[in-house]
């Protein structure tokens, strides 16, 4: 995995050493209006990040690509992630509510998508999110995602109250 630098932030490959700072970010209650729940403890998060440092599933079928988002003040403000299988990826992201509405989430997801297309040969992307999370729906729509078909919802096991959004990528 590469470090991805932009003028507004840096995406750093996530490692266990990020756990302490990210625990504070992920303890932001506003994030969980539409998400499940915060990490139960710093130790739990550190263990999770250690596992994710392998960058792949035990059977080798999936690549786990996780980046933390660092702004120029050196503060971590969230993460972007992709679970990659040949040709496609499931993406997810979380951003501290203190940084919502500034275009940083959009920029970070866009930078990750560019990396996935250029260096991991990803051609299609999908994201599962809560239907009521309009901020996230709009972010994905601005990046070219659209609502998936009912058949795709079933295939990706989207649950009641969730929406599946898809995007077909083209190389620039």
Briefly describe each language-model feature range.
Residues 53-56, 154:
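Short, P/G- and charge-enriched loop/turn segments at secondary-structure junctions
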Residues 30-53, 65:
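Conserved GNAT-fold acetyl-CoA-binding loop/helix
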Residues 57-62:
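Short loop/turn motifs at secondary-structure junctions and domain boundaries
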Residues 1-33, 66-172:
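Acyl-donor (CoA/ACP) binding surface of acyl/acetyltransferases
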């Amino acid at each position: 995995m590469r470090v991805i630098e932009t003028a507004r932030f840096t995406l750093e490959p996530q490692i266990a050493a990020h756990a302490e700072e990210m625990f504070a970010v992920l303890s932001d209650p506003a994030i969980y209006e539409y998400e499940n729940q915060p990490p139960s403890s710093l130790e739990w998060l550190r263990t999770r990040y250690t596992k994710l440092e392998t960058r792949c599933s035990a059977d080798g079928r999936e690549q786990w690509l996780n980046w933390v988002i660092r702004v120029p003040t050196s503060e971590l403000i969230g993460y972007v992630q992709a679970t990659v299988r040949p040709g496609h990826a499931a993406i997810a992201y979380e951003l501290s509510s203190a940084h919502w509405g500034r275009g940083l989430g959009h920029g970070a997801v866009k930078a990750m998508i560019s990396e996935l297309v250029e260096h991991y040969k990803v051609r299609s992307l999908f994201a599962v999110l809560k239907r009521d999370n309009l901020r996230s729906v709009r972010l994905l729509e601005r990046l070219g995602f659209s609502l998936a078909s009912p058949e795709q919802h079933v295939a990706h096991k989207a649950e009641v109250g969730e929406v599946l959004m898809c995007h077909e990528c083209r190389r620039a």
